[in-house]
Amino acid sequence: IKLERAIIKIQSVKSKLLTDNVGFIRISQFQERTADDVALAYTKLADQAPLKGVVLDLRNNPGGLLQAAIGVSAVFLPEHSLVVSTRGRTPENEKKYLAVLRDYAVGNESPDHIAQVPESAKSVPLVVLVNPASASASEIVAGALQDHKRATIMGTRSFGKGSVQTLIPLRVKNGETTGVNFTTARYYSPSGRTIQAKGITPNIAVDDTPEGNYPSFNLRESDLAHHIEVTDGKNEDAKAAKKETDDAGEEAFDEENAKVPTLRYMFGDDKDFPLEQAKNQLLGKKVITHAETQAKLKAEAKTAKEKAAKEAAQKEKAKAKTDAKGESK
């Protein structure tokens, strides 16, 4: 068998028009063409119907190119808006990235589809879905749209990969080259929030299913050994916010007889619970939040516990009655 080494290009953007004229755009990772593809996807959706809103799905998106993240943000933000900044120990690591062509351009491709996106993209109601597997570039986009109050972030707190790596080329013998990747800076959202080990906290916490969160989705940067910790005083409020969304659903799993989510779905299908809640948010309907899901699970666990205790008491009473009859004989 002959195998040829090659770069596998994946279609990173998928879109469709949902019921009630709500657009759905899913990004699986940030590649060279991702930003242009998002711009084209929005244009196509806007041509199909007068959009009542758009859901931008970044769940399970591990990140990718910084330029692509800036470009996707630029689709929905006014030109020249601050998207993200970096800070490090040296002046060359102090940078600001704006929603402009020079910061999101990848190569010399033309035309600039982002500049040609309909003006409605800057004002259409927008919900961004994230989960603990949304990392790096995904968090840059979510943080920018949240800080500019351009979108409502829904789901569970993101991964928290906010470190910047720089490749230092090294020359070895025989003319071969290699390199070492160093962490040199951190990413900060437009308002100055660090992403590192904190992630993006949703405006509205929503579980993966009506039965709670999938346990497998709850690993984050802050759970990894020797991760880069953040000690900025500015982020004390993030610690308080973390209590609400960190490991969402954990309390329910600690309850005796609590349910483990069994519902499995594909992102974007009709059983996608967070997507349904995102649609409800855009349409002004009732949203089932994390707090409500947990309250329901706790109530169900309490009811099940009381029922089991009642049944056990009845069995014990029946047994005592039987034993008493036996003794009387």
Language-model segments: what does each one mean?
Residues 2-4, 9-329:
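C-terminal "post-core" interaction segments
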